Amino acid sequence: SSVIFPFPRTGDVEKDSEPFRRYQLIRLAPDLGGESNDASSFRIYSMVCVHMWCLWDYIEGREVEVNGEKFTGNIECPCHGSNYDVRDGLSHKGPAIKQSKPNDALPTLPLEVDENGDIWVLPPDTALEADGVVGLGRYV
């Protein structure tokens, strides 16, 4: 499952709908450990494809193979066909895979899950070596 949300949220409907504020929280499939109720079950990625800044789609039930490993769930850009590994946001198919680092991985947001099961987004480190920059990428 997944949910799309703005970050940082401003309360202004127009600003909160800007593409560069759109992130998607993804609960990993069970074959990737997604049944756990801790932070390891979740990923948050910027929805802006690092290839040409289109907004990607999360295909929850899609079976994919990356480097010989098969799993469920894929991030796909409908504009030019870039695909990203749901586990780490690194491109594995399409034009984004041909881009030099750090322009081949989706920026992320850190998160934690508290004792009540609530998910909290933590302040990001926007360095390319950390959580990355929307539209540019990050090092993986």
Label for each model-derived stretch:
Residues 1-65, 105-140:
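N-terminal pre-ligand scaffold of iron-sulfur
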Residues 44, 72-74, 79:
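Disulfide-bonded cysteine motifs in exported proteins
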Residues 52-53, 78-83:
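Detector for the c-type heme attachment site
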Residues 61-64, 70-72, 86-117:
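Polybasic, low-complexity binding patches
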